[in-house]
C-alpha cells in the first residue's frame, strides 16, 4: 500500500481522523485513498512513470507525492460532511490540485521518475506553444 496509517499522523491529529471515520469503515478509507491515488496518477501520467511512483513503499516514496495524495484523500473523506471541513483542508486540496495542474502542463517540475521506453530511454514529449491566443479566422 502506498499510503499507511502512520502517514496520517503527520497531517492530522488522531482525534480528527477518528471524527472523520466515525461513520466510515476501513473500506471507505481505502476507497478515498484509491480515489486520491487515481486522481494524482491522472495528472502525472503524461510525463511520469506513475506505476513506479506508486509502487514504492516506506522511505523510497516521494514525500511530496505522499503529502498531496493524503491531502486529496482527506478532502474526499470530508466531502460528505462539508460543514465540518476546515478551511485549511479545502485550501490544501486546492494547492495540491494547482500544483498537479502546473506539472501536467509542463510549467512545474517534480523530482519523479520519467516515463521510459522499452530500451530504457527517457521519453519527452514535444509541445508546441505560442504567446498568442488562438483565433478562429473562419469567415
Predicted segments, located by residue:
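Short loop/turn elements at secondary-structure junctions
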Residues: 75-139
Amino acid at each position: 500500500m502506498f499510503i499507511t496509517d502512520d502517514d496520517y499522523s503527520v497531517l492530522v491529529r488522531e482525534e480528527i481522523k477518528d471524527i472523520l471515520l466515525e461513520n466510515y469503515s476501513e473500506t471507505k478509507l481505502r476507497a478515498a485513498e484509491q480515489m486520491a491515488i487515481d486522481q494524482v496518477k491522472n495528472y502525472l501520467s503524461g510525463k511520469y512513470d506513475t506505476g513506479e511512483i506508486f509502487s514504492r513503499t516506506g522511505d523510497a516514496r516521494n514525500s511530496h507525492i505522499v503529502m498531496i495524495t493524503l491531502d486529496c484523500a482527506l478532502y474526499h473523506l470530508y466531502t460528505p460532511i462539508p460543514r465540518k471541513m476546515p478551511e485549511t483542508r479545502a485550501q490544501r486540496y486546492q494547492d495540491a490540485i494547482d500544483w498537479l495542474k502546473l506539472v501536467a502542463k509542463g510549467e512545474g517540475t517534480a523530482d519523479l521518475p520519467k516515463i521510459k521506453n522499452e530500451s530504457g530511454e527517457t521519453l519527452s514529449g514535444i509541445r508546441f506553444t505560442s504567446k498568442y491566443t488562438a483565433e478562429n479566422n473562419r469567415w
